């Protein structure tokens, strides 16, 4: 699942 990261980068999980 793809969740928007809180750092400004794209987190791919």
From Swiss-Prot:
Record-given protein name: Allergen Act d 12
Family membership: Belongs to the 11S seed storage protein (globulins) family.
Keyword Transport: no
Tissues/organs with expression: Expressed in seeds but not in fruit pulp.
Protein origin, superkingdom: Eukaryota
The keyword Protein biosynthesis is annotated on this UniProt entry: no
Organism: Actinidia deliciosa (Kiwi)
Keywords: Allergen
């Amino acid at each position: 699942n793809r969740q928007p990261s809180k750092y400004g980068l794209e987190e791919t999980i």
